[in-house]
Amino acid sequence: MNVDTQLSRDGLYSSLRTRYKVYISMHAFAIWHRFISFLAIYLWPCIMGSVNLNLQDRENEYFFDSIQYIIYTSELLVGDHELQRSHHEEQPSLVYPSSSFSSTSKFWRYFAYLLSLQIVIDFVLYKLSSAMASLHYLKFVKIIALSYICFSSLIRICHCWTYFIRIMGLSSLNKFVNLLHDFETTSNRVYSQICELEANSAANRSRLMDFLPANDPLLFNLTEQNTLSYELSGLYEKLLPRYQLVLSRIYPYAAASNLRNLLSLYRLPNCFGKLNSFDLRKGSSTSLKRSSMYLARKENQDFDDQSTQILNHIKTAYYELTIISKQVLCCILSFPVDSFLAERSSWLIVHREVGDLSNALSVSMVRLVDILKFSVESVNRNQHNTTSKPFPRIMCKENLRSLFNELHSVMMETHESISSYIQEGDNTAMQTYAMDEYDQVGLLLKDLLSEWDFNRALLLNLQHMHRKRK
């Protein structure tokens, strides 16, 4: 009886102790659950942000500020938007980015900071749960902590992969806009030198064409402008299909509303249709002409028709490249950031397509640099021939004498033809007209002689003053 009583007491005591442990464990679990809920609701967003597949709003702003900063600093969209005007009327839909988000290295360091913070938190949580698990009724805490760490690691892996593809796309974009900037600068230099050759050709063509031999360097320089013009426009035309291909592949990933606002903001033509296709010439705007390419050497507008057509051909080809490159950048700026899968696809396509376009642009830059070197040599040779040897054959006495002999022969032939025409006396009106024309030629010759007398007197005066100074 005593033995049975002792056994029943031990069983009851063991049962009560087990129930007490269960109660304590449930109470501890409730307290721990409240602590985790408080941490997730109030403290966790302040430390790491919301735990989901989407990135934090600050990270999204950080990334797009980096893109905008790259584009703005490359001067590809500066001056072609309506931010200044809309600032006084209403809040603009796009603001200037901050220079603190100016490089992919800062963006990567920011992510490394978040990743390090996550590792430290996971380590502290693991150590704390291991210490609490030493108590028999808190062993489940370690299981909860390990489950949370695994889930957090999975989220961080997705986060890391998103950062990685974003940084790849950002690096490709950075390389692309830098190449665009170099391409534009080199193109403007070539264009300015072509205009300089054109100006020299227009000034010298009428005076040189009749008196210089065919193998003279000055006459040879007159044809170099045409060669450079066709080389440059041909280079632009080869790049245009590659730009169009990249634009057609990037456009489906852009948010329609964001893209529409950006095209309106930068006054770009909305060439995109419902079938993910576009027409470059639809709604083209003349307000997007680059000042350096379209207003360079504005004073030289008196070219002949052939040269003007060549220069206009260059400007048209470059204008199309400028429009479509801005549309590519606007498509990238309008990418939505709403899911991991969408971002993975969009930024991978940016990394691949924009990277390929950058490679094609690099190859074109090599050819453009060759054209630039040739244009520099042409301009230097033209300047050397026109300054160091200013019209050597025209200014010599023999050439001047032959020129006046030809002029004298023409005047004598005209005099004889008019005198014979007057002697016939068939048409009085035609005789009067012929005499008027003859008188006008004489007046021009008198003006030329008067100008020669004036210039000769001026030269004599300068010579006299120079002798006095000595």
From Swiss-Prot:
Gene Ontology CC terms, in alphabetical order: cell division site; cell tip; peroxisomal membrane
Transmembrane segments: 22-44, 111-131, 135-155
Organism: Schizosaccharomyces pombe (strain 972 / ATCC 24843)
Primary localization: membrane
Glycosylation sites: 204, 221, 385
Flavoprotein keyword on record: no
Protein's job: Required for peroxisome inheritance. Acts as the peroxisome-specific receptor for the myosin V motor myo2.
Entry membrane topology: Multi-pass membrane protein
Location of this chain's protein in the cell: Peroxisome membrane
Keyword Glycoprotein: yes
GO BP annotation list: peroxisome inheritance
Keywords noted in UniProt: Glycoprotein, Membrane, Peroxisome, Receptor, Transmembrane, Transmembrane helix
Similarity section: Belongs to the INP2 family.
Protein name as catalogued: Inheritance of peroxisomes protein 2
Entry superkingdom: Eukaryota
An example molecular function term from Gene Ontology annotations: myosin binding
